[in-house]
């Protein structure tokens, strides 16, 4: 169980109120808070397994008929209320309950986080990897016994929109809970609770979105104390992403009677990303998410809605429009992945070696700028190419998530259409690209665009932070290393 560490008494009261805004300030926070949940549903409805991706009517906006569009996207007869169901909500809550039970009873190890600005360190119980393996073992056993008809897989496919809604409601409820509870934070409290510097602007919607409390914790009956932010970041959403991918593999098999290499490839590399992250769970305790950002709707929604449901778009697409990459395709996409991974790992390794052992032969030759703060800013090697060359590697690794979908887009025709080049489902329906070819890229390649924006925003935050920390030295450094992420472009 997460615990408390009382090595040092809290020194300060709460974070001082400040008016520095990100994400477009209160207006941007309002738009994101209420716009992104709609966008997640739009992606599911407009790229569907009923009529196509995108829905055919969207290709002819001038003659768009709303009634026809509703039929094409499977809009519920009872309207928006049909996007909710008690069964999906209860099973979703059951999934969270299972995560909590695993957190409580599965073995793990206890570590301390970084020192808080108010003094002291929080303790964390880390067993996300064990929890994930336990859940996947249960799902594997069910799949071995019942194959693609395993009820978990069919329930996800049949209730996908309702599961999205259940998680959206949970994200809002959790964000409201921690926001209201954050006003109980008192100076010098024994639990070492504190407010996040960026979440006390005085704007209700902005602070609700960014998060007021830095490390909100809750004590639950039979479970004990849980660090909400660390728990949500490393458990239900990340594992849920892989569970959804597996559900779409099962769906492809039910629709066609086979599974393609493209959907397996995407699932494999995304699973590697997730398992690498949860296996290295202690590393998250030093990230900005844990040490600096408050826990609000941004992280609540991102953890349990945005990551699992938007990041699984490609496998959801391929479950309906199967693509075989073949040996050449797998090698080509794998090469992009290898290039990105190499840049990311080699650059980070070089920086880490330089910081921990600057006399190491592999980094001893590197030039650097000595700052007044005592830090050394590397100006050659990987870090002489761009100030965040590791971000370039990270971004390149996002491309293999989308490339296997090809020039995306498809239409679903009724059985017996006998369309040229059609892929026929087991129930006789036919899938063709037709005039939808290329338009599906809006959905399947969205992740690449989103991730680029995320990295650029992260770079801007880092630039501002370093400018305050290093002053004139940072300006000198930027003249020596001109490019931010992509040399010659940005």
Swiss-Prot record:
InterPro entries: ERG24_DHCR-like (IPR001171), Sterol_reductase_CS (IPR018083). NADP(+) binds at residues 351, 355, 378, 383, 390-391, 462, 466-470, 477. The keyword NADP applies. It is found in: Membrane. Keywords: Lipid biosynthesis, Lipid metabolism, Membrane, NADP, Oxidoreductase, Steroid biosynthesis, Steroid metabolism, Sterol biosynthesis, Sterol metabolism, Transmembrane, Transmembrane helix. One of its GO terms (molecular function) is NADP binding. It catalyses: 4,4-dimethyl-5alpha-cholesta-8,24-dien-3beta-ol + NADP(+) = 4,4-dimethyl-5alpha-cholesta-8,14,24-trien-3beta-ol + NADPH + H(+). The keyword Cytoplasm does not apply. One of its GO terms (biological process) is ergosterol biosynthetic process. One of its GO terms (cellular component) is endoplasmic reticulum membrane. Pfam families: ERG4_ERG24. It comes from the Eukaryota. Pathway: Steroid biosynthesis; zymosterol biosynthesis; zymosterol from lanosterol: step 2/6. Its EC number is 1.3.1.70. It is a multi-pass membrane protein. The chain crosses the membrane at residues 23-43, 80-100, 136-156, 160-180, 230-250, 255-275, 324-344, 436-456. PANTHER family: DELTA(14)-STEROL REDUCTASE, DELTA(14)-STEROL REDUCTASE TM7SF2. Reduces the C14=C15 double bond of 4,4-dimethyl-cholesta-8,14,24-trienol to produce 4,4-dimethyl-cholesta-8,24-dienol. Belongs to the ERG4/ERG24 family. This is Delta(14)-sterol reductase. The gene is erg-3.
């Amino acid at each position: 169980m997460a615990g408390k560490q009382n090595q040092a008494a809290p020194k300060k009261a709460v974070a001082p109120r400040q008016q520095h805004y990100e994400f477009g300030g209160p207006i941007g926070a309002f738009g994101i808070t209420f716009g992104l949940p709609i966008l997640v549903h739009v992606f599911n409805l407009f790229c569907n397994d009923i009529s196509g991706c995108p829905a055919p009517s969207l290709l002819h906006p001038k003659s768009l008929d709303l009634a026809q569009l509703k039929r094409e996207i499977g809009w519920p007869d009872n309207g928006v209320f049909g996007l909710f169901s008690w069964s999906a909500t209860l099973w979703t809550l059951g999934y969270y309950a299972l995560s909590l039970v695993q957190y409580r009873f599965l073995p793990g190890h206890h570590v301390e986080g970084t020192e808080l600005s108010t003094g002291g360190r929080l303790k964390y119980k880390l067993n996300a990897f064990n929890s994930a393996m336990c859940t996947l073992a249960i799902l594997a056993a069910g799949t071995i016994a019942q194959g693609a008809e395993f009820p978990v897989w069919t329930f996800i496919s049949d209730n996908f929109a309702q599961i999205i809604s259940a998680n959206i409601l949970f994200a809002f409820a959790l964000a409201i809970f921690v926001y209201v509870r954050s006003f109980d934070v008192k100076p010098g409290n024994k639990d070492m609770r504190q407010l996040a510097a960026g979440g006390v602007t005085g704007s209700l919607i902005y602070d609700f979105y960014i998060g007021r409390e830095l490390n909100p914790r809750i004590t639950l009956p039979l479970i004990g104390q849980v660090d909400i932010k660390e728990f949500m970041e490393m458990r239900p959403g990340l594992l849920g992403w892989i569970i959804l991918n597996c559900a779409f593999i099962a769906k492809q098999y039910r629709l066609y009677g086979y599974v393609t290499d493209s959907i397996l490839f995407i699932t494999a590399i995304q699973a590697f990303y997730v398992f690498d992250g949860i296996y290295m769970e202690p590393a998250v305790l030093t990230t900005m998410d844990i040490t600096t950002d408050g826990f609000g709707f941004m992280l609540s929604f991102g953890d349990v809605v945005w990551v699992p449901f938007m990041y699984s778009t490609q496998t959801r697409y391929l479950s309906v429009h199967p693509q075989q990459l073949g040996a050449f395709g797998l090698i080509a996409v794998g090469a992009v992945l290898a290039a990105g991974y190499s840049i990311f790992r080699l650059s980070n390794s070089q920086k880490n070696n330089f910081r921990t052992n600057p006399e190491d032969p592999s980094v001893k030759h590197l030039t650097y700028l000595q700052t007044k703060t005592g830090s050394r800013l590397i100006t050659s090697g990987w870090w002489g190419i761009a100030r965040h060359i590791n971000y370039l590697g990270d971004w390149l690794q996002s491309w293999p998530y989308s490339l296997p979908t090809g020039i995306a887009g498809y239409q679903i025709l009724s059985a017996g259409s006998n369309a040229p080049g059609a892929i026929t489902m087991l129930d006789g329906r036919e899938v063709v690209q037709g005039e939808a070819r290329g338009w599906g890229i809006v959905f399947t390649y969205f992740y690449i665009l989103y991730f680029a924006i995320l990295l650029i925003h992260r770079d801007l935050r880092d630039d501002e932070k370093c400018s305050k920390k290093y002053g004139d030295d940072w300006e000198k450094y930027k003249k020596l290393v001109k490019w931010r992420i992509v040399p010659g472009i940005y």
